[in-house]
Amino acid sequence: MNTPAINLETEKQLFFHNYARLPLDIASGKGSFLYTASGERYLDMIAGVGVNAIGYGDKRLEQAITEQASKYIHVSNLFMQKPQFDLAAKLLEISRMSKVFFCNSGTEAIEAAIKLARRFAARNGDTDKTQVLSLTNCFHGRTYGALSLTAKPKYVDGFEPLVPETGMIDFNDVEDLERKVSNRTAAVFVEFVQGEGGIHKVSEAFIAKLKELAKEHDFLIVADEIQAGCGRTGAFFSYMPFDIQPDLVCVAKPLGGGLPLGAIIGSEKVAEVFTPGSHGTTFGGNPVACAAGLAMIEAILADGLMQNALEVGSMMRTAFEKMAEKHAQILEIRQYGLMIGVTVHREAKYYVEEALKRGVLVNATSNNVIRLLPPLSISKEEAQLCLDTLDAIFTEEAKA
């Protein structure tokens, strides 16, 4: 077989056109930087869209992967596997919850949570309790159940009809929450910090009312921690600063240390809902991914990366606020740990392209939001490089 050229022309020939790829042939990574095959260096402020929490080339992560891979890479979930036990125990210790189910991705975690919520109601005799709700501007995934809970029309276009008995509550609208939930509601899914939606945090008032209504109507509260979890906001899970304990927590992205891994974590209330055969997966909880996940979590805890997320994130927010005083292009700044959204006056894609030319990788979401999701291990000096780059772009844009 001839080795294909690595460029955008070949990419169009080989793949379905799912991604608007950047013209970079990535060869390696170290710390907060990626390197191309031609030797160019890029500061990665995307981190695999929030996956690479401890950066690239961490020896502890590499050792965990190679040690487990040398023993076995896969066996059926019909067998007990130490990497699964170790990671599940760590997640339950952190969350103070009751049970774990491993899958392969965030969207699979959402699907499992939808199934569990409906089965929980059915097993309690509430066969009409099938409604599953989410919030506007949310993103929960691309498989049909998760897609049905996802707000943006561009993800839904052409895929209707979606799963019935799903719907949206207006984000942070307490009155709409009261209107939408009822005794037919099985679950409400919440991103406590919306990532794809532009880095927006749910309000204390909304969560207080959600708790009250969940008790009144006996529905489950599901925290989607796929992007905001594993320390990114400065707490291990973004729901933790709120006065709430969800019934289910969905986790993925950084959970596998860069390998495919997702999970739902359940409270004692839902601990007995799944029974053998009611839900499952061939590859979920892959032992190599679980070993990597444990190493990743231990690195976050040992290296104080949640505190680093708070400190570097605060430093970046302050810098952006000063930047906004001289650059009218910046309309709003939202920052929760190292989840940062900067609303700008035009399509954010422009700034993505300009930063790329200068060796910095940033992301655009919600049309006019620059989204930054760097490794939690990023230094203040590296963050300053990103800030200086964006400052220069804003300055040059104003002169044009």
UniProtKB/Swiss-Prot annotation:
EC number: 2.6.1.11
Cofactor: pyridoxal 5'-phosphate
Organism of provenance: Chlorobaculum tepidum (strain ATCC 49652 / DSM 12025 / NBRC 103806 / TLS) (Chlorobium tepidum)
GO biological process, one term: L-arginine biosynthetic process
Protein name: Acetylornithine aminotransferase
Note: May also have succinyldiaminopimelate aminotransferase activity, thus carrying out the corresponding step in lysine biosynthesis.
Keywords for the protein's UniProt record, in alphabetical order: Amino-acid biosynthesis, Aminotransferase, Arginine biosynthesis, Cytoplasm, Pyridoxal phosphate, Transferase
Any one Gene Ontology cellular component term annotated for this protein: cytoplasm
Protein family (similarity comment): Belongs to the class-III pyridoxal-phosphate-dependent aminotransferase family. ArgD subfamily.
Top-level EC class as recorded in UniProt: transferase
Gene transcribed to yield this protein: argD
Pathway stated in the Swiss-Prot or TrEMBL entry: Amino-acid biosynthesis; L-arginine biosynthesis; N(2)-acetyl-L-ornithine from L-glutamate: step 4/4
UniProt lineage: Bacteria, Pseudomonadati, Chlorobiota, Chlorobiia, Chlorobiales
